[in-house]
Amino acid sequence: DTPSDGGWSFFPGTNGLMYWNESYGSEEPVFIAGAPDMDNDGTLNSITEIAYYGSSISSHPSMGVDANGCIYVSYSSVMETLSNGTQNYRNILVTKSCDGGCSWTEPLNVTPGTGFEECQFASMADLVDNNINLVYQRDFEPGMAVQGDNDAYVMNDIIHLSIPVTDFD
């Protein structure tokens, strides 16, 4: 980018969440997680089209911390093998770190159902107790009505999940 040209860039094919805190100093951020390679071929090659949200393949993180200092991160991710034939669905995944963010567990897909739901904009409670509590928006068509592919307006559900922290052990 050229700061003085007044333009901007958007890289929708990027994948991954990074974590950094003040204790890292000048060290690089740590890779947390990204979209899962669901067909285990080493690449994300089954993505037909990414629904436009103004974000990347894995995005919209939200964090919570438990009494032991473990960090939990939820995020929305394109699901490689779950498509309506035009666009891939997004599900909500959660990962955790108990060492200050140096390492992270394998992300767990916490989306109930078959996965053929568009799940976006998760918001996790800041304080995690025996459960991770989060809410997210769900409908059954990838994308949005207000921008991007301009899907038809449909009723969206706001879903609450309470996930036992023992699911991450």
Stretches found by the model and what they are:
Residues D1-D169:
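Extracellular, repeat-based ectodomains that mediate carbohydrate processing or recognition
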